[in-house]
């Protein structure tokens, strides 16, 4: 299979140029002006469009069972939506397994979930839900098998205490793995939640009030300090929602500590006023949506380089599930938002087209830095000879309004309903194969490949 993309503006994190791009057998073979292939190939005219590396979303939750519900997107519908939004690689956060289970148990379960369903290439983050000698001994073996990142939780059922966190940080660091963490102070949240429930205050807005930004920021500061105690272990903070936590991360970075951070479109573009709408339960996620002042602080981090990655935390529960389970009580509502299809378009529109970020910075946030941090570079996140032919073509001249009925996930709503975006995803290629074109999904279940990721190597801070 040969594909020649002509006349587009090819953008990588380190620059852009109007040039052609030749893909053969799923691999980028040549970039240059006026490429004339010696053999027949499919030609795609990208005149007036940006040609970006396919998106790498390093934070999804497909087919996750949270105890009270299972998310409504599996690895087919979830990766289909990703493909239609210009994302060609996902790294899924595996959910909690049975009490006391080994790391391998969840890996085998999740490989079974994805094997015959994934449309695009995929990998997984391990999840450490308890610490014992067997788990610590298993970590190096998992890294050898291509899982080079693991997630810890400071809240929820399988939260770790500080001693367990230190043990995990040390062993992961020794084994060549990156520690990722969901940072919220569980005790403070439980106290606030109990206070509201006792007073009969169960409307959606009390979800946000029960998880104030200080709960998140305190946990971020604690993790930074624990990582330092654990021998300057590398640390990745997921789904940052506030500026105080970002200040702590800036300070750590100024002290040359190896810390990185992601945020998500919902924290950049949605705010806490959503909880006071008639459909406020649609927006229950943790950490919760914040106020506009916090949005502005995050945008500063996007613009000045303090934030490294924009991912989605895609975790879809239908409105029907939310209403049936919660019965109007925020504390019973399953957490999470859809968004894997909208990430690239939303950030392009609100970032590149407004002048907040350059096209190169867009690549850094959506594909290049995720690939570097999580052991996929230069196979992913780059358009250069030898890299995978993963491409998203965006036409900046087109304007689109997001409507759920046109999306490809399995949710029954979109938090982005009615958002108007400047710039449209017109084509997605995965390893040279067109899997989305002009509004139509053309991929197939099972074509995605499991990616064995390289051990963690820190990018230059």
Curated annotation (Swiss-Prot):
Cofactors that this protein relies on: a divalent metal cation
Enzyme class of the recorded protein, top EC level: hydrolase
Cystine pairings recorded for this chain: none
Sites where the protein binds a divalent metal cation 1: 59, 61, 151, 313
One Gene Ontology molecular-function label: hydrolase activity, acting on carbon-nitrogen (but not peptide) bonds, in cyclic amides
List of residues binding substrate: 156, 286, 335
Key word Metal-binding present: yes
Coiled-coil regions listed in the entry: none
One GO cellular component term noted in the UniProt record for this chain: cytosol
Annotated SUPFAM superfamilies: Composite domain of metallo-dependent hydrolases (SSF51338), Metallo-dependent hydrolases (SSF51556)
Maturation and modification: Carboxylation allows a single lysine to coordinate two divalent metal cations.
Keyword Hydrolase belongs to the record: yes
Function: Catalyzes the stereospecific hydrolysis of the cyclic amide bond of D-hydantoin derivatives with an aromatic side chains at the 5'-position. Has no activity on dihydropyrimidines. The physiological function is unknown.
Family: Belongs to the metallo-dependent hydrolases superfamily. Hydantoinase/dihydropyrimidinase family.
HAMAP family: D_hydantoinase (MF_01644)
Full protein name: D-phenylhydantoinase
Organism: Escherichia coli O6:H1 (strain CFT073 / ATCC 700928 / UPEC)
Gene name of the encoded protein: hyuA
């Amino acid at each position: 299979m040969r594909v020649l993309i002509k006349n587009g503006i090819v953008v990588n994190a380190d620059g852009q140029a109007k040039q052609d791009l030749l893909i053969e057998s799923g691999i980028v073979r040549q970039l240059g002006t006026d490429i004339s292939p010696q053999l027949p190939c499919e030609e795609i005219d990208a005149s007036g469009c940006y040609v970006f590396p396919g998106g790498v979303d390093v934070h999804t939750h497909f087919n996750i069972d949270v105890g009270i519900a299972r998310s409504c997107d599996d690895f087919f519908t979830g990766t289909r939506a990703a493909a239609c939004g210009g994302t060609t690689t996902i790294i899924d956060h595996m959910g909690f397994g049975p009490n006391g289970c080994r790391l391998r148990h969840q890996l085998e379960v999740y490989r079974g979930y994805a094997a015959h369903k994934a449309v695009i290439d995929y990998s997984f983050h391990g999840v450490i839900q308890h610490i014992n000698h067997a788990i610590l001994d298993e970590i190096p073996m998992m890294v050898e098998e291509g899982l080079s990142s693991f997630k810890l939780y400071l809240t929820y059922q399988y939260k770790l205490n500080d001693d367990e966190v230190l043990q995990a940080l040390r062993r992961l660091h020794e084994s060549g793995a990156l520690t990722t963490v969901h940072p919220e102070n569980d005790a403070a949240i439980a106290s606030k939640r109990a206070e509201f429930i006792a007073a009969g205050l169960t409307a959606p807005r009390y979800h946000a009030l029960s998880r104030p930004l200080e709960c998140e920021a305190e946990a971020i500061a604690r993790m930074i300090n624990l990582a330092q105690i654990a021998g300057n272990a590398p640390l990745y903070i997921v789904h940052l929602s506030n500026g105080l936590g970002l200040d702590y991360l800036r300070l750590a970075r100024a002290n040359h500590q190896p810390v990185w951070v992601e945020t998500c479109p919902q924290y950049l573009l949605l705010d806490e006023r959503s909880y006071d709408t008639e459909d406020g339960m649609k927006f229950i996620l943790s950490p919760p949506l914040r106020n506009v002042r916090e949005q502005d602080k995050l945008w500063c981090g996007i613009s000045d380089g303090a934030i490294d990655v924009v991912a989605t935390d895609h975790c879809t529960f239908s409105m029907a599930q939310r209403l049936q389970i919660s019965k109007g009580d925020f504390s019973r509502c399953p957490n999470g938002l859809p968004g894997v299809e909208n990430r690239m378009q939303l950030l392009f529109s609100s970032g590149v087209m407004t002048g907040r970020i350059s096209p190169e910075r867009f690549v850094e946030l959506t594909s290049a830095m995720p690939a570097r941090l999580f052991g996929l570079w230069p196979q992913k996140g780059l358009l250069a000879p030898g890299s995978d032919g993963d491409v998203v073509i965006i036409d900046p001249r087109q304007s689109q309004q997001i409507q759920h009925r046109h999306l490809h996930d399995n949710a029954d709503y979109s938090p982005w309903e009615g958002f108007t975006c400047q710039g449209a995803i017109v084509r997605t290629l995965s390893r040279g194969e067109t899997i989305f074109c002009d509004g139509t999904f053309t991929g197939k279940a099972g074509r995605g490949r499991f990616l064995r990721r390289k051990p963690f190597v820190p990018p230059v801070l």
